[in-house]
Amino acid sequence: RLSYFLWSSMPDEALMKLARAGKLSNPAELRRQTERMLKNPKAAAFGRHFPERWLKLHELGRMEPDKRGPYGHYFRVKEYLVPQVDAFFSDLLETNGPIRNFIDSDYTFMNKMLGELIYKQKVVGEHLRKVKLEDTRRGGLLTMPAVMTVTANGVDTSPIVRGVYVLENILGTPPPQPPPDVEPLSPDLRGVKTLKEQLAIHRNQEACRSCHQKIDPMGYALES
């Protein structure tokens, strides 16, 4: 299982020998083998497959924006979105960087197209490279365009969807399913102008309050 998890292929002879001897049940030996395997070129598969499954990047393209709409630039950067996440994850793994960089880093990986259309920074060439961010609010995984796109519907964004995404995929504390008798939003929205105001009304409903007090702040943080 360790080999297929890290290499997406069969174990080598060294790992087989240790497994037959029952030595992989020893935490120290397991750690040694994990570190050894991550240095092997085969571990590049882990650098691709793990973040893509973890962050649900297979859902990219499920609801693409209108090419003529305000998010039409998506189609010019689409091919770089998943590779950007993979490059960031693999670099953090290879350098044994601090885990907080997943959430807050002062750098990212970009090329000319991503720099021009997403980050508003000048970068030369098509190759993704490690670049210090001029706006550090764009650091980490959560603000990468791949994640922003996965948590949108092609027309607009949703703080609820993004809040649930953070709770499920980053914090590992998914909220329970909403009660079956709760409407998506309160029918009485007179005088309400913004989505934030609509959701505030929703949170005032007793059946919604406990979950949305956790969901909504997470989602709002990704809306600015």
List each model region and its residues.
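A cross-family structural signal marking well-folded subdomains
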Residues: L6, R20, A28-Y165, P176
